[in-house]
């Protein structure tokens, strides 16, 4: 799974609990994926292709090439 090169944001794991009437009938695994894009950014005067999350792109933490 891709991880943000700026803030190291990646996938999160947990459980999905299904409720049947008044008792818990089962738990299954779930993965929440971050909104990570492959973009060209400016690094040290050149361009480089990296995975960056959309929150870092929106906040202006990187400059697109």
UniProtKB/Swiss-Prot annotation:
Keywords: Ribonucleoprotein, Ribosomal protein
GO molecular function (one): structural constituent of ribosome
Entry-linked InterPro entries: Bacterial_rp_bL28, Ribosomal_bL28, Ribosomal_bL28/bL31-like_sf, Ribosomal_bL28_sf
One annotated Gene Ontology cellular component of this protein: ribosome
A Pfam entry, by short name: Ribosomal_L28
Gene3D superfamilies the UniProt entry points to: Ribosomal protein L28/L24
GO BP, sorted A to Z: translation
Lineage top rank: taxon: Bacteria
PANTHER family cross-referenced by the UniProt entry: 50S RIBOSOMAL PROTEIN L28, LARGE RIBOSOMAL SUBUNIT PROTEIN BL28A
Similarity comment text for this entry: Belongs to the bacterial ribosomal protein bL28 family.
Protein name according to UniProt: Large ribosomal subunit protein bL28
Organism, as annotated: Lachnoclostridium phytofermentans (strain ATCC 700394 / DSM 18823 / ISDg)
Lineage of the organism: Bacteria, Bacillati, Bacillota, Clostridia, Lachnospirales
Originating gene: rpmB
